Amino acid sequence: MISKINFVKMHGLGNDFVIVNKRDLSSSYDLSQLAKNMAERHTGIGCDQFILYEEHNDFYEMIIYNIDGSSAKLCGNATRCLAKLIYLDTGKQDITVMVGNKKLLCNVNDENNISVNVGSVSFNEAWMPSRDKVWEFAERYMIDLKETICVDIGNPHVVIFSKLEPQDQKIVGERLQAKELFADGVNVNFAEVKDNKIYLSVWERGVGLTLACGSGACGSFAAGLKHGFIHSPSTIVFKHGNLTMKEENGNIIMQGAATLVARGEYYCEQ
């Protein structure tokens, strides 16, 4: 039997999403498999991540799937996209999004200016691998550990301020997913600082290299502040646009654009 699923395609600075309202899905769907199928760029719609959302009394619940069908704990760009979608559909400008237990406070100033307060970050190193393993890995790829930091923004990130060539970023991003280093994988941020701006590329676990990463921007901004490399406010620069970042009372606030690409119907065999 073929069923029809309404979807929205959006992107945040090139980081693209297929977004589906959970009310449009029956309980019979294998959501992990559906995410993989719709994310496939040749036989599906194509995206970096598949987003489900559901409206509750005073917040919207967001569930994130990677292209490999695994779940993600946070996505800043998807949050901005969802906030814009809700604004377009309802006119609401102040929107609360819940991802698991994390509350994200969103404000849509206008269609191209959406801010997200992602809250505080943690530099607790309990989830890091042993220092011996890290040193061995760092020496192999000439990474300066004094310029490397782990940060949890709701999902785990490693931020590397040592300059690496694009081909080396791919290798390092892939190999840091090794179970003996990070049991559940890790998002890897390659950051270069110039004039209080961070030029950033990100290897997202479960996805690979992406054109932009909102949670990576937040984690890298927080890491840059901790190292003293930048001050607040600052700018995160991606290939297809920038995010403005600031810190207020220990909270990280991200601001930038989100783009509506298409609305459509996906036909799914069950």
UniProtKB/Swiss-Prot annotation:
What the entry lists under InterPro entries is as follows: DAP_epimerase_AS, DAP_epimerase_DapF
The organism's place on the tree of life at top rank: Bacteria
GO MF annotations, alphabetized: diaminopimelate epimerase activity
Please state the Enzyme Commission number of this protein: 5.1.1.7
Gene Ontology CC, one term: cytosol
Task: Tell me which residues are marked as the site Could be important to modulate the pK values of the two catalytic cysteine residues.
Answer: H157, E204
Quote the catalytic activity from the record. Answer: (2S,6S)-2,6-diaminopimelate = meso-2,6-diaminopimelate
Compartments annotated for it: namely: Cytoplasm
* Pathway(s) of this molecule: Amino-acid biosynthesis; L-lysine biosynthesis via DAP pathway; DL-2,6-diaminopimelate from LL-2,6-diaminopimelate: step 1/1
- Ranges that cross the membrane: none
* Coiled-coil region(s): none
The entry's keywords: Amino-acid biosynthesis, Cytoplasm, Isomerase, Lysine biosynthesis
Which residues make up the binding site for substrate? N15, Q49, N66, G76, N77, N155, N187, E204, R205, G214, S215
Q: Name one GO biological process term.
A: lysine biosynthetic process via diaminopimelate
UniProt-annotated catalytic positions? C75, C213
Q: Which PANTHER family match?
A: DIAMINOPIMELATE EPIMERASE, DIAMINOPIMELATE EPIMERASE, CHLOROPLASTIC
Purpose of the protein: Catalyzes the stereoinversion of LL-2,6-diaminopimelate (L,L-DAP) to meso-diaminopimelate (meso-DAP), a precursor of L-lysine and an essential component of the bacterial peptidoglycan.
Summary of subunit composition and partner proteins: Homodimer.
Assigned protein family: Belongs to the diaminopimelate epimerase family.
Q: What is this protein called?
A: Diaminopimelate epimerase
Q: Which organism is it from?
A: Rickettsia rickettsii (strain Sheila Smith)
